[in-house]
């Protein structure tokens, strides 16, 4: 399941701009395959960072990951042309910075966060309180 959809991208971009970024043959329509490829590339980039700490791809996509998937996919679409506008480049750089911090463990993705203490295969042992201590047996 992709982290973002074409509808998510259209929430951020006007359809006219999306047509300009995807329509190489001048048909006047959004080319779905180009959008799908940009999203897949964004997902792969996110998985590359998050895969160091999380099981990827995510079954349930955290909202922040969806947001950054959209930002990265839009940046990828602009990269096919002359380059991204300054605000889109800044959003992309912020996404990469965030994902770098996630991979280093400095930022948590919330409920999907891996346990900070790895499970052990060692048995757990509990003892009752001691009846005789060293001080009790000192003069014995």
Each predicted region: which residue ranges?
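Short loop/turn elements at secondary-structure junctions
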Residues: 75-140
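Conserved short "hinge" loops at termini or chain/domain junctions
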Residues: 1-65, 121-140
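Ordered, amphipathic secondary-structure segments that act as subunit-interaction surfaces
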Residues: 48, 52, 64-84
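Short alpha-helix boundary/capping motifs
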Residues: 37-38, 70, 101-102
């Amino acid at each position: 399941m992709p982290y973002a959809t074409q509808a998510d991208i259209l929430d951020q971009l006007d359809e006219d701009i999306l047509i300009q970024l995807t329509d190489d043959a001048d048909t006047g329509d959004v080319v779905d395959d180009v959008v799908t490829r940009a999203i897949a590339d964004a997902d792969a980039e996110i998985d590359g960072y998050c895969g160091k700490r999380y099981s990827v791809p995510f079954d349930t996509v955290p909202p922040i990951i969806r947001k950054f998937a959209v930002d990265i996919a839009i940046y990828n679409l602009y990269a096919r042309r002359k380059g991204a506008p300054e605000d889109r480049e800044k959003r992309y750089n912020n996404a990469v910075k965030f994902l770098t911090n996630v991979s280093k463990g400095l930022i948590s993705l919330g409920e999907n966060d891996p346990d900070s203490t790895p499970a052990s295969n060692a048995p757990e042992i509990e003892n009752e309180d001691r009846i005789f201590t060293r001080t009790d047996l000192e003069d014995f």
